[in-house]
Amino acid sequence: KVSDSAYSNSCSNSQSQRSGSSKSRLSGSHSSGSSGYGGKPSTQASSSDMIIKRNKDKSRKKKKNKGTGQGAGQAQTLISASTSLEGRDEEKPRPSGTGCVEQQICRELQDQQHGEDHSEPQATEQLQQEEEDQSGSESEADRVEGVAKSEAAQSFPIPSPLSVTIVPPSMGGCGGVGHAAGLDSGLAKFDKTWEAGPGKLESMTGVGAAAAGTGQRGERVKEDSFCCVISMHDGIVLYTTPSITDVLGYPRDMWLGRSFIDFVHLKDRATFASQITTGIPIAESRGSVPKDAKSTFCVMLRRYRGLKSGGFGVIGRPVSYEPFRLGLTFREAPEEARPDNYMVSNGTNMLLVICATPIKSSYKVPDEILSQKSPKFAIRHTATGIISHVDSAAVSALGYLPQDLIGRSIMDFYHHEDLSVMKETYETVMKKGQTAGASFCSKPYRFLIQNGCYVLLETEWTSFVNPWSRKLEFVVGHHRVFQGPKQCNVFEAAPTCKLKISEEAQSRNTRIKEDIVKRLAETVSRPSDTVKQEVSRRCQALASFMETLMDEVSRADLKSGSSGNFTTASNIHMSSVTNTSIAGTGGTGTGTGTGTGTGTGTGTGTGTGTGTGTGTGTGTGTGTGTGTGTGTGNGTNSGTGTGTTSSSRGGSTAIP
């Protein structure tokens, strides 16, 4: 079997060089028998005392060969011959009894009860070889303690998930001389974890990892969240906190070297990818992201199918997922976490820190009556009824993730018996939309949740109307659960059987839904009282302007009336003027003037006339009148008269 892990290759090279294998030194192969990937029995899990002892023997042989005074070629020949003999001795398989191996496997299954798919031949051979290597060398507890110490020696302390500087065993150097014993145990554990190749989540991860996880769970209190560090170069998980065992059931090191998106539900992978692609440009533009700047969203993560929870029927059991709220934080990789062979393109060396918190159902008992202090969540939908936004707080109350609701019609979640109530509610929404910022609370109604039950909601409705087109843009409902569902766990799968409704009821419900959508698409009219107020305000402004204009015209007419023969006056009352004109030595002239206005009044005027000897004369007269109205009027009279001797009569007409 050829190794598919870059980490195991590098570690195998260093181990083979340390052990002095002639095969690996002379051929330059990247795989060796000691790594466990070359088809030979693995010796990584054996005691480190034997390796150190062989190294000392080889060093003495080298010194002895150098001290003999022979040539460099002869010394190299002797060293190669001795190491080749040792390599042949190491490659011989160790004898083992079949009955003893079977007893050890049964005893291990009874004690550990950890791992998933024990039916695979590769996992069985690996367990047999581990039991053979461990017999007479060291106890299980000592080996686990050595693994923990080696991990602690290669790791950095983590005060918080936001300041992660831990380097996994694969990222450190594999050829250190001073840490040979710790590296051997750590590499053995890491190779066992990688032995289950990508995609085989049900395979064994090694007895050491299982024992370490069991010991850690017994010593500490269970946590309800976990964190992991992901490389943004290839999406590989570099580190996970031990609490992942309590939350999802996975051994601590099982995620290392795997892609994080493989554990995300298929329907949520697009959401996860969009959050990543959105967060990377923001982090690069800011240069350094503050610690409190997080991107939060919800996904479903895969739960571990172990033998402890479901017995040996791993393959027959379905894969289960649980909802989690993920907090993303982008950070630059520390210098200690960048080995020489870790090449990053375009100068990017970013790490993604994910803090996952499980989401639990909000209900404890069936048909629970919640208090008024229960948290609110908002759902926004367009005028066509399509949901466009959902708060993450709705997940624990409804069981849906936001991406499960967005793009669906909100009419499908209303109870069929409450559609008439919802029609009245949307009528009120359209009326309240005439006033900007108006809101109201509707009657309680039933809403469908993820497990197939209904909850009773109390909603405060608001809407936004486009001020230019007078069209409804969207409706926002701030919901609060008044009564819980009959089934407390909102994340359970909905029943396959649907509620039976008569065809008449279905047609009626369809008609009501269509009426609601048509009503929301109508133009929102302005209220009549608002129109009246605007007209009254405009009339008052126009009347004030006209009064000012008439006052100016009246003053100009009074000044020009005494010298003119014909005057046009604007007045706001009715007046009647009678003028008498006397011409020459006895001529008389009379004139009448009328004016129209908004008021009534009477006025008197005097007229003067001149006559010639022939008996003709002209006369002009002006008359003013006052009335009970609010204005004053001016009249201008002119008259002409004819006479035989000394008198003339003339008439005058006032033009308003």
Swiss-Prot record:
Its main location: nucleus. Changing residue 653 to A: In strain: Merano 7 and Merano 8. Residues 584-644 are annotated as: 30 X 2 AA approximate tandem repeats of G-[TN]. Residues 1-161, 580-656 are annotated as: Disordered. Residues 53-66 have a biased composition (Basic residues). Keywords: Biological rhythms, Cytoplasm, Nucleus, Phosphoprotein, Repeat. It is found in: Nucleus; Cytoplasm, Perinuclear region. Phosphorylated with a circadian rhythmicity, probably by the double-time protein (dbt). Phosphorylation could be implicated in the stability of per monomer and in the formation of heterodimer per-tim. CDD domains: PAS (cd00130). Contains a remarkable run of alternating Gly-Thr residues which is polymorphic in length. At least four types of Gly-Thr length exist in the natural population, (Gly-Thr)23 (shown here), (Gly-Thr)24, (Gly-Thr)25, and one minor variant (Gly-Thr)21. This Gly-Thr stretch is implicated in the maintenance of circadian period at different temperatures. Deletion of the repeat leads to a shortening of the courtship song cycle period, and thus could be important for determining features of species-specific mating behavior. The sequence shown here from 1-559 is that of strains SI-CA1, SI-CA2 and SI-K2. From 560-656 it is from strains Merano 4 and Australia. This is Period circadian protein. It comes from Drosophila simulans. The lineage of its organism: Eukaryota, Metazoa, Ecdysozoa, Arthropoda, Hexapoda.
